[in-house]
């Protein structure tokens, strides 16, 4: 086999292996709403990548929300999202309810529980 044909064959083989490699699967990150001794998100800050999903779960009897909307926050600094991104809101989450959001834009998202923002129930998602 000539040198040019061998290089061509090796190049095609390498491209085929690269093209066949599976894409990295999107991750799902879990956040739990806790009530004792105070209302908090656990963990309070999560890091994820574009395409990942965060799922919040309320295992307790106290109603909570996941609200990333400055218009609904008492302190606008507690609900922040990247420019051009639409706000999101779980609405009221009763016991055992879950809410999921897939992040498609890089940036820092600060969110609140509408019922407990004044008590410090705030969280952050950092998307890279």
Predicted features and spans:
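Extracytoplasmic copper-binding redox domains, predominantly the cupredoxin/blue-copper superfamily
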Residues: 3-128
